[in-house]
Regions:
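Charged, flexible cofactor/metal-binding loops and thiol motifs
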Residues: 117, 122, 144, 152, ...
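Short, well-ordered beta-strand elements within core beta-sheets of diverse protein domains
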Residues: 41-51, 120, 167, 236-244, ...
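A helix-coil-helix interface module used to build multimeric assemblies
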Residues: 1-202, 207-211, 275-276, 287, ...
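Generic, well-ordered alpha-helical scaffold segments in large soluble proteins
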Residues: 41, 62, 66-69, 91, ...
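Glycine-rich cofactor/substrate-binding loops
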Residues: 1-37, 98-99, 280-456
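A generic structural-conservation signal
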Residues: 54-55, 152, 222, 383, ...
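Conserved hydrophobic residue
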Residues: 50-51, 75, 265, 380, ...
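Short runs of predominantly hydrophobic/aromatic residues within well-ordered alpha helices
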Residues: 38, 85, 89, 235-238, ...
Length: 456
């Protein structure tokens, strides 16, 4: 098949080479951005008298027709074309004849594809950001519901100190809020227009790059034409942000998986977000959370694939850069899918308050508060720490808990103990004493909820 770029060569390539070289099976998803960019480009060419207004009007009308026909299904994208840019230009030329051949004036596919992918990823970034905000809202609403629900807090997966389930959930809300901030920051660098950089050196035509940038929603220009066509930092940065976001979702998923197990029984997932077993009728498997955890590695792989592709490329454009899209598109699709399932999974998740509280009553998670009680009586912390540890060891040896020890036993370890110690080591008291900013007290959790909602 002869190509629109035939000139130096006859354009007659082997079928296997055509298939190997083609990107339309994956870059066709950018047809809307490609056509929108071309309409603005045609208008700019007319505004600078590079083509006539009549030709520009015909080009824009023809492009609108192609867009409408693709949207309606009347025009299937020809997968035999090399890429989406060539498909659109070929279809336009078929409809308009020689006028269609004027569209590519003062433009290269190098800056055209750089434009398309920035516009496409800008939209996808905004979609992901909104999905993350929906998840933050779901997590925050759940945190408010359970702001007084006592559970063990863990370090090393060992029971450590009493917290509330609301406090634990708000930790994820804060992580996700940082993800939103990172995406917004990435968008600033992404939203620079490369159109007008042409192949690599700019153009001899008196174009108006600012006109195109403004009308395509960009905040400014790529100010070096070599950089404009070869830059894929915004892809790598977006995928880095996605990798961190997926890491947060994976950590949350891991805890949901643990919490929903019989060993914990802290939460119950809706049947709508679990599956059964083909052989074990009693099973209720947290497959959605497990898949999110598994797909995290996939997004990491997409990022590493892109970075590896880019690491040795000389300036400016190289065909290797065609390989950026499949990695980026896969990461976009995966992240969106994970968020779309995560939001309702959290919204429908129920906490088992009795099991959480029962778990908090074991493991001596109020031992720190016992030490703090002695510190407030005037004992140095390290001395108080030692006494508290000795009392825990005594309880373990005698199969009891701190709350059940008589005062006489406490007095054998320190004469600073009195009846008030039982209030000090009460679990709800332990929680409510954590009044520092960011702490687990109900008031502190309420302040965190208020902050996050204001930030959204």
């Amino acid at each position: 098949m002869a190509k629109m770029w035939a000139g130096r060569t006859d354009g007659m390539t082997e079928k296997i080479a055509d298939d190997f070289n083609s990107s339309i099976r994956f870059d066709s998803r950018m047809y809307r951005q490609d056509i929108t960019g071309s309409m603005v480009h045609a208008a700019m060419l007319a505004s600078r008298s590079i083509i006539t207004q009549a030709d520009a009007d015909a080009l824009i009308e023809g492009l609108e027709g192609i867009l409408n026909d693709i949207d309606s299904g009347a025009l299937p994208i020809d997968m035999e074309c090399e890429d989406i840019h060539m498909f659109v230009e070929q279809e336009l030329t078929n409809r308009l004849g020689d006028v269609g051949k004027k569209l590519h004036t003062a433009r290269s596919r190098n800056d055209q594809v750089a434009l398309d992918i920035r516009m496409y990823l800008r939209e996808e970034l905004d979609t992901v950001s909104q999905l993350v905000k929906q998840l933050i809202t779901a997590v925050t609403d759940k945190a408010e519901e359970y702001k007084s629900a006592i559970m063990p807090g863990y370090t090393h997966l060992q029971r450590a100190q009493p917290i509330t389930f609301g406090h634990h959930l708000m930790a994820y809300a804060m992580m996700l809020l940082r993800d939103v901030e990172r995406l917004a920051d990435c968008r600033k660098r992404m939203n620079r227009s490369p159109i007008g950089c042409c192949a690599l050196a700019g153009t001899t035509y008196d174009t108006d790059r600012d006109y195109e940038a403004k009308n395509l929603g960009f905040d400014g220009l790529c100010l070096n034409s070599l950089d404009g066509v070869s830059d894929r930092d915004f892809c790598a940065e977006l995928m880095s942000d996605f990798a961190i976001l997926m890491m947060h979702l994976s950590r949350f998923s891991e805890e949901i998986i643990l919490w929903s197990s019989w060993e914990f029984k802290f939460v119950e997932l809706s049947d709508a977000f679990t599956t059964g077993s083909s052989i074990m009728p009693q099973k209720k498997n947290p497959d959605m959370a497990e898949l999110v955890r598994g797909k995290t590695g996939r997004v990491y792989g997409d990022l590493m694939g892109l970075l590896t592709t880019l690491k040795g490329l000389p300036l400016a454009y190289n065909k290797d850069m065609q390989e950026d899209k499949e990695s980026v598109f896969d990461a976009v699709d995966t992240v969106k899918m994970c968020l779309q399932v995560f939001v309702p999974m959290v919204q429908t998740m129920k906490a088992n308050l009795d099991n959480m509280k029962l778990a908090a009553q074991k493991g001596f998670i109020n031992a720190t508060d016992l030490a703090d009680y002695l510190v407030k009586k005037g004992l140095p912390f390290r001395s108080a720490y030692k006494i508290s540890g000795q009392l825990v060891a005594y309880c373990i040896q005698n199969n009891t808990v701190l709350e059940a020890l008589p005062l006489d036993t406490y007095l054998q370890y320190s004469d600073l103990f009195d009846q008030e110690l039982y209030t000090a080591i009460d679990l709800m008291t332990c929680v409510e004493k954590r009044i520092s900013k960011g702490g687990t007290s109900v008031a502190s959790v309420e302040a965190q909820i208020k902050y996050v909602r204001e930030m959204l």
